């Protein structure tokens, strides 16, 4: 059985879906005001890998990942370049889809955009007001945190902890709130900003309400898994829980999953620190599969340190797997030995999607394959495991002149003309083709 580390309970729990053999997942997507950086891509790759493993295990996955296209950062960025917020969002949504396609990310079941859910957001906020969980103040609408049952339980904080942190705050928005901890569900329009009509006057939604509405509209009041980066645990996911459960009276998500950060020199990669590298720029010099492999093969909850050496190691390891995949097939091999590798891989991945242990099994299997165990059944199993990591190798073919040289070398070896055989081998090596003579015949790989 798959076990998931649930942030809410701080424990490893058996995964039991609401509907048998179906997984409903909502993963917070990007705020589309710029290209995503490697840290953002970590979340995208981690949850794509988790989704792929569920599918490997036979589940149908409804995978929802949103685009936040209404936000302060988008408004600011659009104003700076003199275009509409929609034009800016459209540009970076397209860039996101193109960049993540190179990382082998499967298309989501749906990628909802906030701009398409405005009526539903207004209706959601209205219900919270009617139930006494929210109030209007000078055109803004705020959520009453003190009315929420066990607020901040996800972040393992108490109201007292938060109140200490909020003490002493003073600004115009705080003055409009009943309590400094209250958060905005709806923001009154400011001059020159995009806005929508509402019962409380023109304005736009707050960030937290957007995800609650899109998740529940598409997947229902309770979902199996809600995921995102560890930085979203508080306040974003905390506030999603508060407002969603206030509206429905039901548990919002049964499992909460959070991926670790990408660090540079052991410091979190972020735009605010200026130590980030965009995926868009990285893909100009690094193959998308290499970057994917670097991100996918670390246990998703642990931080990753981003270094040139780590990328180089991923490239070398991926090349070994590619060469293994291209080996010629052998005679039928031991199914018991194959099953042992499959069982070990499943045991690793069932343990909270431990890709670090899973990839160790993958390389053990590759070593076994290279020792002459590679029939159709093994190749199919090997490819399916690679696909969990988002890796698909195209079948490689050789040019006719290369094939002819290999045949000439085989003939020379048969005639014990080893000088000619060695000359052809060296000629092929100069072209990046490495030959390996085995009892099953000659194998080749590309350097």
Swiss-Prot record:
Catalytic reaction list: tRNA(Cys) + L-cysteine + ATP = L-cysteinyl-tRNA(Cys) + AMP + diphosphate
Keyword Ligase: yes
GO molecular function: ATP binding; cysteine-tRNA ligase activity; zinc ion binding
Record-listed ATP binding positions: 271
E.C. number: 6.1.1.16
Motif ('HIGH' region): 30-40
InterPro entries: Cys-tRNA-ligase, Cys-tRNA-synt_Ia_DALR, Cys-tRNA/MSH_ligase, CysS_C, Rossmann-like_a/b/a_fold, tRNA-synt_1_cat_dom, tRNAsynth_Ia_anticodon-bd
Motif mapping: 'KMSKS' region: 268-272
Record's subcellular location: Cytoplasm
GO CC, any one term: cytosol
Taxonomic superkingdom: Bacteria
Keyword terms: Aminoacyl-tRNA synthetase, ATP-binding, Cytoplasm, Ligase, Metal-binding, Nucleotide-binding, Protein biosynthesis, Zinc
Record carries keyword Lyase: no
A Pfam family that the UniProt record links to this protein: CysS_C
Gene3D superfamilies: Anticodon-binding domain of a subclass of class I aminoacyl-tRNA synthetases, HUPs
Protein's GO biological process: cysteinyl-tRNA aminoacylation
Chief location category: cytoplasm
Assembly and binders: Monomer.
NCBIfam families tied to this protein: cysS (TIGR00435)
Record's protein name: Cysteine--tRNA ligase
Classification of source organism: Bacteria, Bacillati, Bacillota, Bacilli, Lactobacillales
């Amino acid at each position: 059985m798959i076990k998931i580390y649930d942030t809410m309970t701080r424990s490893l729990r058996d995964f039991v879906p609401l509907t048998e053999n179906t997984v409903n997942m909502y993963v917070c997507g990007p705020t589309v005001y710029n290209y995503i950086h490697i840290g953002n891509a970590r979340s995208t790759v981690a949850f794509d890998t988790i989704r792929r493993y569920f599918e490997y295990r036979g589940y149908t996955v409804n995978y929802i990942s949103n685009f936040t296209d209404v936000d302060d950062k988008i408004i600011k960025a659009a104003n700076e370049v003199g275009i509409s917020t929609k034009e800016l969002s459209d540009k970076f949504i397209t860039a996101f889809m193109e960049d993540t396609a190179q990382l082998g990310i499967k298309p989501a079941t749906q990628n909802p955009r906030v701009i398409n859910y405005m009526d539903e957001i207004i209706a959601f906020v209205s219900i919270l007001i009617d139930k006494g969980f929210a109030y209007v103040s000078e055109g803004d609408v705020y959520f009453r945190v003190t009315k929420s049952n066990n607020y901040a339980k996800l972040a393992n904080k108490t109201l007292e902890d938060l109140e200490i942190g909020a003490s002493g705050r003073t600004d115009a928005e705080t003055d409009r709130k009943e309590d400094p901890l209250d958060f905005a569900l709806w923001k009154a329009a400011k001059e020159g900003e995009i806005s929508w009509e509402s019962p409380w006057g023109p304005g736009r939604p707050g960030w937290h309400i957007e995800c609650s509405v899109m998740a529940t509209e598409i997947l229902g009041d309770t979902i199996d898994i809600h995921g995102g980066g560890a930085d979203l645990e508080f306040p974003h996911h905390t506030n999603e829980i508060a407002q969603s459960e206030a509206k429905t009276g039901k548990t919002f998500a049964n499992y909460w999953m959070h991926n670790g950060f990408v660090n540079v020199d052991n410091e979190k990669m972020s735009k605010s620190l200026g130590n980030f590298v965009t995926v868009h720029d990285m893909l100009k010099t690094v193959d998308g599969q290499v970057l994917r492999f670097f991100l996918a093969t670390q246990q998703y909850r642990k931080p990753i340190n981003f270094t040139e050496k780590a990328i180089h190691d991923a490239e070398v390891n991926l090349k070994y797997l590619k060469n293994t995949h291209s080996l010629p097939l052998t005679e039928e091999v031991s199914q018991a030995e194959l099953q042992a590798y499959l069982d070990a891989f499943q045991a690793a991945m069932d343990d909270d999607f431990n890709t670090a242990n899973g990839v160790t099994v993958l390389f053990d299997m590759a070593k076994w394959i290279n020792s002459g165990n590679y029939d159709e059944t093994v190749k199919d199993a090997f490819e399916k495991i690679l696909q969990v990591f988002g890796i698909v190798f195209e079948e490689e073919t050789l040019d006719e002149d290369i094939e002819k040289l290999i045949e000439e070398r085989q003939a020379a070896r048969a005639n014990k003309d080893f000088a000619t055989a060695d000359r052809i081998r060296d000629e092929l090596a100069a072209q990046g083709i490495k030959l390996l003579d085995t009892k099953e015949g000659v194998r080749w790989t590309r350097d």
